[in-house]
Amino acid sequence: MIDFHCHLDLFPDPTTVLNGIDKRGTYVLAVTTTPKAWRGTKKLVGERPRVRVALGLHPELVAQRHHEVALFCGLLAETRYVGEIGIDGSPPHRGSIDLQKSVFDRILAACAAAGGRILSVHSRGAATAVLDSLERQPTSGVPILHWFSGTKAELARADSLGCWFSVGPVMLRSRKGRELAATMPMDRMLTETDAPFGRDGDSPLMPWQAYDCLDELANLKGLGVDTLRRQLIANLRRLPKLVEWSG
């Protein structure tokens, strides 16, 4: 099982969640929302071979935490994975969008200078702005657009730029989410939960529930579930080879 976008440190009891991950053999990318949270999450995860921790600066927090971008850049040499980063154009965060763009551009430039990173990218309400930034920094790494909700034209542009995509059970509950997922390139897709924000009724999804969307995704792609599982694992294994990192 693969959960390539999970806020592990934001669960009420992350240790219990980690024990569940260990028990089930789930592969997890634990994204963070601030650089200051990265070291704590790394310590929490320890040496678990199936869990990676991404260095993040969430766009919703940029207005308050933009000064942490220097710390972010200072930590970049220690990780292959970056996220959650990006731009949020939803109404509550439009007031900081110019600052968000500036911070995102600086992060991408730092990633490019460091040889590229695997990037878990937020683009809600700002897909065009995110793609503009990625196009300006083509060597920043491998962008994986998490829970992409842009237009079909923006999806086509993202595809042409070589972007990857992570999709999950909540995304595939909506008609638009299913329509977008149906046209995403299967060899550049992974599964996610966005837990604990992604929910199953009144409860947060758990990382091992990322595959709750497999039947729906297999149907959208015209594949058998076993074939889809193999493709997702092949994608995950290929990903680290696409960036330079000697840490």
Regions picked out by a protein language model, each given a short descriptive name:
Residues 1-247:
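Mid-domain alpha/beta scaffold segments of enzyme catalytic cores
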